[in-house]
């Protein structure tokens, strides 16, 4: 029978009691009020708001807009002086028509611009922009990762980055093509704001789970033995025991039922959030396609679409601003790095020092290193293939905006199906997770290899196959979505098998940084190849190599060995921790004792 809260707690105001009760509080100032339906709605609302940018803008309309704005100001590659056409036809034209016979599709002429005297292909311009944005985003995400889990800034930063990204998209409406450099800056700001805000949004998830009424009830029952501890150690204690630190899973009571309940709820909330975000993205993508057709597929149509995406992002961030509680985290020991007005330095230094310690620990785990190396290449391939394919379809096949948007819709639908179908395929063929990932990689390799077929003379004479006709892009879009659904489902869970128990947050932070940081290289290399050869198709050779390289690395990963090494490292770190030395910190790395005296924001 579940024990009831003590009478002194029941006599207090419910909110005040939950804020003060020692069993539920892991650190002074923690807001342990039960997670409400309204607060969950606020959390879901931001996914509904921002996922539209990731899917519709970054995955489709933003690279097209950047290419078209530079094309409007560029000159033909062939003679370096004839201005490119400022219009983009929506129907087949002289250079894009396909007759009744299967003749090769001839795309619009290649165009270049000059930035600081350097000749850049208009398609490369978009790729370079994304590489720069990912670099800045990665540095920012690492620097503010401590703020995501410590102190009172989590919600404030979330809203600030959301506002920054949404306004950047809204401003596209007022940009004329001659301001294409400013458009690139806005794209960088928007992508940086999106990435940082989603890190902060994800940091709310464990807090919402921990304070769910069902979890709180279970925790109270499981922690009844701690009543004695808190009675003997009143709230005036000046330290928090390392075992209570947020980064570590609270397994001191060996309450596996509590851990399982939290994992189930976390998975449910995360899946719901992803599903809600994708539904919003599909709806907005379809609406944007209709808007583009209604406005005759001009450059203004693209800017209007980005304005709509930014407005959507801004409007649906409002419920998150109203309903999400600040939920302060434990304080960073700023005495080590900065005080007073320089306290913000402590967050940045703490984050980078913590990352370094996690990397040092990861070096002791061979299979973690193999997987992260494979994931570094694979995630770069995933991000690069998407942008490359859209720009190839526009500049080589002459596909109009609506047709390009439809590719993204097909990929999203296929991705949802892939998330479910790979589970069935794995079960049917009795595939281990590592082999399922290998199967996804092999299928992924089909995309660049298929594009390279267009170089073969006899294929070129056919006028079809090898990405010579627009309809082929839809087939490859479906394959891309299917692969992405499988990799998204399996890579994260597979990595979880290889990391030390109880150190999940710090290693998943390294996983996320590897994912985000890798994407700065692929687009830049594709851009350089496009500049060198004057077209995108040769870049498929690089993409084929980029996707192939993770294959042998993934085959070298030994799950049993990885689990054994991870367990040994966890036991060794726990032994060091028990002797009073540093261990692990929340969502980054360093374990430390946090001094009390912290007051967080309370609603």
Curated annotation (Swiss-Prot):
Organism of provenance: Coccidioides immitis (strain RS) (Valley fever fungus)
Keywords of the record: Amino-acid transport, Autophagy, Glycoprotein, Membrane, Transmembrane, Transmembrane helix, Transport, Vacuole
Name under which the protein is recorded: Autophagy-related protein 22
Gene Ontology CC terms: vacuolar membrane
InterPro entries with a match to the protein in the record: Atg22 (IPR044738), Atg22-like (IPR024671), ATG22/LtaA_families (IPR050495), MFS_trans_sf (IPR036259)
Subcellular location: Vacuole membrane
GO biological process: amino acid transmembrane export from vacuole; autophagy
Function: Vacuolar effluxer which mediate the efflux of amino acids resulting from autophagic degradation. The release of autophagic amino acids allows the maintenance of protein synthesis and viability during nitrogen starvation.
Main location: membrane
Membership in a protein family: Belongs to the ATG22 family.
Topology with respect to the bilayer: Multi-pass membrane protein
Glycosylated sites: 254, 582
Claim: Glycoprotein is one of the keywords in the record: yes
Residue intervals passing through the bilayer: 46-66, 122-142, 157-177, 181-201, 274-294, 304-324, 342-362, 368-388, 401-421, 439-459, 464-484, 539-559
């Amino acid at each position: 029978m579940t024990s009831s809260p003590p009478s002194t707690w029941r006599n207090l105001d419910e909110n005040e009691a939950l804020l003060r009760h020692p069993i539920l509080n892991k650190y002074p100032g923690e807001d342990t009020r039960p997670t409400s339906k309204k607060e969950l709605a606020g959390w879901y609302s931001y996914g509904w708001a921002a996922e539209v940018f990731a899917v519709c803008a970054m995955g489709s309309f933003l690279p097209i807009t950047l290419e078209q704005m530079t094309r409007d100001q560029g000159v033909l590659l062939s003679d370096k002086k004839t201005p490119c056409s400022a219009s983009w036809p929506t129907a087949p034209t002289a250079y894009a028509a396909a007759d009744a016979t299967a003749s090769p599709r001839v795309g619009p002429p290649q165009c270049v611009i000059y930035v600081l005297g350097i000749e850049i292909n208009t398609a490369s311009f978009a790729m370079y922009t994304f590489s720069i944005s990912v670099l800045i985003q990665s540095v920012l995400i690492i620097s503010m990762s401590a703020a995501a889990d410590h102190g009172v800034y989590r919600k404030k930063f979330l809203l600030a980055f959301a506002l920054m990204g949404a306004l950047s998209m809204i401003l596209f409406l007022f940009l004329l093509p001659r301001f294409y450099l400013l458009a690139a800056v806005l794209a960088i700001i928007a992508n940086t704001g999106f990435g940082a805000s989603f890190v902060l949004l994800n940091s709310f998830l464990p807090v919402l789970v921990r304070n769910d009424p069902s979890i709180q009830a279970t925790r109270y029952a499981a922690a009844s033995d701690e009543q004695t501890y808190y009675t003997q150690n009143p709230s005036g204690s000046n330290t928090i025991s390392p075992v209570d630190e947020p980064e570590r899973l609270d397994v001191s009571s060996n309450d596996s039922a509590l851990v399982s309940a939290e994992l189930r709820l976390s998975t449910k909330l995360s899946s719901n959030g992803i599903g809600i975000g994708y539904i919003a993205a599909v709806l907005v993508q379809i609406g944007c396609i209709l808007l583009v057709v209604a406005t005759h597929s001009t450059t203004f149509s693209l800017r209007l679409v980005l304005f709509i995406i930014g407005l959507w992002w801004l409007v649906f961030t409002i419920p998150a601003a109203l309903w999400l509680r600040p939920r302060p985290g434990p304080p960073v020991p700023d005495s080590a790095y900065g005080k007073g007005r320089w306290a913000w330095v402590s967050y940045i230094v703490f984050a980078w020092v913590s990352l370094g310690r996690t990397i040092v620990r990861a070096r002791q785990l061979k299979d973690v290193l193999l997987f992260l190396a494979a994931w570094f290449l694979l995630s770069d391939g995933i991000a690069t293939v998407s942008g490359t394919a859209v720009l190839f379809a526009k500049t080589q096949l002459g596909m109009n905006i609506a047709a390009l948007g439809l590719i993204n819709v097909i990929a999203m639908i296929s991705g949802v199906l892939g998330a479910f179908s790979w589970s069935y395929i794995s079960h049917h063929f009795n595939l281990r997770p590592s082999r399922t990932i290998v199967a996804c990689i092999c299928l992924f390799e089909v995309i660049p290899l298929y594009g390279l077929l267009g170089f073969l003379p006899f294929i070129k004479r056919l006028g079809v196959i090898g990405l010579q006709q627009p309809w082929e892009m839809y087939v490859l879009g479906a394959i891309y979505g299917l692969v992405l659904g499988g990799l998204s489902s399996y890579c994260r869970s597979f990595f979880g098998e290889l990391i030390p128990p109880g150190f999940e947050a710090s290693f998943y932070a390294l996983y996320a940084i590897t994912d985000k940081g890798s994407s700065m290289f692929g687009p830049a290399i594709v851009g350089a190849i496009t500049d060198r050869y004057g077209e995108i198709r040769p870049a498929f050779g690089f993409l084929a190599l980029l996707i192939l390289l993770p294959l042998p690395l993934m085959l070298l990963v030994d799950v049993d060995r990885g689990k054994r090494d991870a367990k040994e490292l966890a036991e060794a770190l726990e032994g060091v921790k028990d002797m009073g030395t540093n261990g692990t910190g929340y969502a980054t790395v360093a374990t430390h004792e946090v001094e009390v005296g912290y007051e967080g924001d309370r609603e």
